[in-house]
């Protein structure tokens, strides 16, 4: 891994940490965070699967000791399953975005949507277990109120990825042959 790639990953991790802390109140008990928005942009501009896994993994570990999760939370909370899923969704996102035979914008939307559903699944299961709720109740609390906001986030990410210059989205020439 060269200096440019390490620096890019460090900047993206810092961006995730900073944007992930803030949660915008949208009503009673509904706070919309920017974690997924930032994560999907990170996934769209990191070329290597390793980087897509590394950044959310470091975010997960840092959040165990520092208040960088949504709403300045720290440690294992009822929503920790969503943070765990950030590491897991890197894999399907990577393969869907890189290898589906469609235009880039459609690959990106599909990768984000599938990843979002996996995130919902892991996060709501973790919440149900953590709070000793039924899966249905956890789904109603942790997923349903956020679906519209997450669709908007995917739309924003798609526009952002489309507008970013290719130089930001690609690996340095010397690393493009690596997987």
Predicted features, each with a name:
Residues 20-31, 59-91:
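Interfacial aromatic-anchored transmembrane helix boundaries in multi-pass membrane proteins
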Residues 28, 72, 104-177:
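Membrane-embedded alpha-helical hairpins and interfacial helices in multi-pass inner-membrane proteins
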């Amino acid at each position: 891994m060269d200096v440019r790639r390490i620096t890019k990953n460090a900047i993206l991790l810092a961006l995730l940490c900073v944007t992930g802390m803030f949660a915008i109140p949208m009503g009673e008990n509904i706070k919309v965070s920017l974690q997924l928005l930032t994560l999907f942009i990170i996934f769209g501009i990191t070329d290597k699967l390793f980087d897509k896994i590394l950044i959310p993994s470091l975010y997960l570990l840092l959040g165990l000791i520092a208040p960088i999760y949504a709403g300045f939370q720290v440690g294992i909370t009822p929503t920790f399953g969503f943070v765990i899923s950030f590491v897991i969704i890197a894999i399907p996102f990577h393969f869907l975005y890189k290898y589906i035979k469609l235009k880039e914008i459609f690959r990106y939307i599909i990768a984000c949507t599938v990843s979002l559903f996996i995130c919902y699944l892991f996060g709501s299961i973790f919440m149900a277990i953590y709070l000793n709720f039924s899966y249905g109740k956890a789904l109603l609390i942790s997923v349903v109120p956020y679906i519209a906001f997450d669709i908007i986030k995917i739309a924003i990410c798609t526009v952002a990825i489309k507008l970013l210059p290719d130089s930001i989205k690609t690996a340095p020439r010397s690393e493009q042959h690596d997987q």
